[in-house]
Amino acid sequence: MNEAKSLFTTFLILAFLLFLLYAFYEAAF
């Protein structure tokens, strides 16, 4: 269960970074 939670946390961080990258791209262009 701990491993699954860690995987979920990693996915959440990746999604957040992807969102920040998209927001920055929209703001720049």
From Swiss-Prot:
Strongly expressed in embryonic and larval somatic muscles and postembryonic heart. It is a single-pass membrane protein. Pfam families: Sarcolamban. InterPro entries: SclA/B (IPR054083). One of its GO terms (biological process) is regulation of cardiac muscle contraction. Keywords: Membrane, Sarcoplasmic reticulum, Transmembrane, Transmembrane helix. Disulfide bonds: none annotated. Disruption phenotype: SclA and SclB double mutants show arrhythmic cardiac contractions and correspondingly, cardiac cells show irregular action potentials (APs), involving 'double' and occasionally failed APs. Calcium transients in these mutants show higher amplitudes and steeper decay than those in wild type flies. The chain crosses the membrane at residues 7-27. It is found in: Sarcoplasmic reticulum membrane. Its main location: membrane. GO terms for cellular component: sarcoplasmic reticulum membrane. Interacts with SERCA. Plays an essential role in the regulation of calcium transport at the sarcoplasmic reticulum (SR), which is secondarily required for regular muscle contraction. This protein is produced by a bicistronic gene which also produces the SclA protein from a non-overlapping reading frame. This is Sarcolamban B. It comes from Drosophila melanogaster. The lineage of its organism: Eukaryota, Metazoa, Ecdysozoa, Arthropoda, Hexapoda. The gene is SclB.
